[in-house]
Amino acid sequence: VSEATAVEVAATGINWNFSPCIAIPQDEKWGRHYEGYSEHVDIVSEMGEASIIGYQTTELGSVNHSIVACAKHFIADGATIWGTGMGNQSDKIDRGNAPISDSLIRAKYLPPYQRALDAGVGTVMASFNSINDLKCHANGYLFNDLLKGEMGFDGFVISDWQGIDEIPGDYKSDIVKSVNAGLDMIMVPGAVKGGGEHYKTFLQLFKESVDEGLILEERLDDAVRRILRVKFRSGLIDNPMTDRTLLEKAGSDEHKAIAREAVQKSLVLLKNDGILPLSNSKHYYVTGSGADDIGKQCGGWTIKWQGELGNITPGTSIIDGIEQYSTTNRNNENKKFDAAIVVVGEDPYTEMKGDSDQLYLSAKDKESIDEVKKMNIPYVVVLITGRPLIVNEIIDNSNAFLVAWLPGTEGGGVADILFGE
């Protein structure tokens, strides 16, 4: 998957991907829960390493290309506590505080980063959260002592999106604290404290800080050296232009097949009382908010920051995939059905917008299930979600229950499992 992703990204002219996220989510209420591979350190370590190798040493078919990977978010973003979220989200969890010991950091949250470094990851992104009430973006122990010193990381550290602005103090002190803490590249989009054009304000205050000795030139030289090192290693200096032949692979049938296989292998069947696999010769009533919605399948970070409902990008919806096998209520004029498939689940979200302590299906989704129950035919529930939800009663009442997670643009992979392919 990461090899194909590298080719797709490189084809656009972008040579750096802010991935993999090797967070270890501990609270399903967190709006970034789905960005982590697992709550188990060994799985996260293994998946993160594989992604980095795929991104940075890509060799897929006749294409030999790579992009720079970024392990994120350093560190313990999945360990924050509900009720410690940032600013006006203080009643939530995203960008909150992780009250954890150094020994727990080393035992649970550091191993995926060690595997990332062993795999040669080029960059690491700082985390929005705090550890014991100290913002990671200002925590020199994490980056100077632990990551660069003890672990020997010689790539560069980048801030998160406007991440230094959340450090207590004025904007100049944010710059000084973050750069001295070991951040080598700062993302400064949007407005900054005190207003003004963000990049001009940053450059002015950064230069002042160096001139005043608040940031030593040695620290600046180190940051520049690290950034150039990654550029040389990635081949960007010797070959800065995009290989346009990669466009032939972008959106190719080969890549779509890889995505579809990934969907097939990531689903979880929680219940089957014999209704699955479905039969090609029967007719199915397909309903629910997620039956024909690629945006819902993709979730957040798709086209827009928070994602968007609807068929917002080319792909195969779940009902499209089902109709590759059998007829549905979209083309069955007789209105006689042997069973029903109800596709329900979460609408797209990301970050603090997805923080929620109400991990239940919406009233609309429950109505769709109740509608099918009244038809007195067997039914399968397919759940689209970025995290576990409380659906015990729905599982009990259904004939089969399949968790599709966020299958992306290849909804046909869900249909493959329903029909036993």
Task: Describe the predicted segments one by one.
Residues 1-421:
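Glycoside hydrolase catalytic-domain context in secreted enzymes
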